Amino acid sequence: MAGLFITFEGGEGAGKTTVIQHIFQKLIAQGIDVIQTREPGGIKISEKIRSIIHDPEHLEMEERTEALLYAAARRQHLVEKVFPALEQGKVVLCDRFVDSSLAYQGYARGLGIDEVYAINHFVIQDCMPDLTLFFDIEPKKGLERIAANKNRERNRLDLENMQFHEAVYEGYQKVIARFPERIKTIQAEQALEAVEQDTMEIISSFLNEKEKGGNNEINYYGDSR
């Protein structure tokens, strides 16, 4: 099976990061050659850029600067980690990708979805995800989850007002409308177990479609159904 690029998207507090970790372990247990990574970050240079973007002291960061920093982190991450993994036939699970930039900077920051996509088109060299899962949660509930999680370190985006987070959600809806075949929606307000099951079922179905011959079916339950 050729390498496959699967991305996970959602607003703050959607719970996708936790789900990715669990899905990653399940795929490993089923013998899938898979890696887990994130944006911005995943490698040394991009993690340093992440710390600059997320630093709560950098409230003066201008919108275009923010968009370009994300794009720079994305490029280095692709070159060092994602491209090599895909070339080796691995499944890549990535926490956020270009859709985040379109929703956050393109729509919520008001830079324009098309304009931000143009920046990223130069960066990604047509490397769009094969499958994207959007974790759907109302912005208010997502922020309530963050507030209740005492172990989560607050970043600069967490400090934005509710209007911004609602705009991010609206931005995602516009991105989903542009890429309806690629982006699948997960109801993230369910219990974690239900969210994981829905996520794994979509990924399993997708991987089975791509698996040549179809002799080694992947399923959430570990049985033959």
Curated annotation (Swiss-Prot):
Gene3D superfamilies: P-loop containing nucleotide triphosphate hydrolases. It is an enzyme of class 2 (transferase). GO terms for molecular function: ATP binding; dTMP kinase activity. It catalyses: dTMP + ATP = dTDP + ADP. Its EC number is 2.7.4.9. Keywords: ATP-binding, Kinase, Nucleotide biosynthesis, Nucleotide-binding, Transferase. The keyword Transferase applies. CDD domains: TMPK (cd01672). NCBIfam families: DTMP_kinase (TIGR00041). PANTHER family: THYMIDYLATE KINASE (PTHR10344), UMP-CMP KINASE 2, MITOCHONDRIAL (PTHR10344:SF4). Phosphorylation of dTMP to form dTDP in both de novo and salvage pathways of dTTP synthesis. Belongs to the thymidylate kinase family. This is Thymidylate kinase. It comes from Oceanobacillus iheyensis (strain DSM 14371 / CIP 107618 / JCM 11309 / KCTC 3954 / HTE831). The gene is tmk.
